[in-house]
Amino acid sequence: MFTAYLILCPIIAVVLVGLNWLLATSNSYIEKDGPFECGFTSFQQSRSAFSVAFILVAILFLPFDLEISSILPFVISPYSNGLYGLVILVIFLILLIVAFVVEIQLKALQLNRTYTNDLPHTELYDININD
């Protein structure tokens, strides 16, 4: 039963995406592709630049968050895991610590911000990873 579920779900997903691609109407024009500002056409750049540091922290947070959530099954049932589960957990934590040390050595977490104002109405930061 579970095998049929694993086979049927991707097939249904591909069929639905294919039907959407075939039947959907594509009517793009400049007002539809641009940002919405209360129905008025914007006269200047309405999108401000994101800080690269914000995106970098978000990208670095995601793998560590997923790895920490992988520890939860051991925390919930430590007595039924036994010695084998403990060894796997220790190996997993060692790999996590080694990855964190490598990120520190590559200076991926050190953000050296130098403000550049080459373009009007934007804030760009040059992040130097290798000093």
From Swiss-Prot:
Pfam families: Oxidored_q4. The chain crosses the membrane at residues 4-24, 52-72, 82-102. InterPro entries: NADH_UbQ/plastoQ_OxRdtase_su3, NDAH_ubi_oxred_su3_sf. GO terms for cellular component: mitochondrial membrane; NADH dehydrogenase complex. It catalyses: a ubiquinone + NADH + 5 H(+)(in) = a ubiquinol + NAD(+) + 4 H(+)(out). It comes from the Eukaryota. It is found in: Mitochondrion membrane. Its EC number is 7.1.1.2. The keyword Translocase applies. It is an enzyme of class 7 (translocase). Keywords: Electron transport, Membrane, Mitochondrion, NAD, Respiratory chain, Translocase, Transmembrane, Transmembrane helix, Transport, Ubiquinone. GO terms for molecular function: NADH dehydrogenase (ubiquinone) activity. It is a multi-pass membrane protein. Belongs to the complex I subunit 3 family. Core subunit of the mitochondrial membrane respiratory chain NADH dehydrogenase (Complex I) that is believed to belong to the minimal assembly required for catalysis. Complex I functions in the transfer of electrons from NADH to the respiratory chain. The immediate electron acceptor for the enzyme is believed to be ubiquinone. This is NADH-ubiquinone oxidoreductase chain 3. The lineage of its organism: Eukaryota, Fungi, Dikarya, Ascomycota, Saccharomycotina. The gene is ND3.
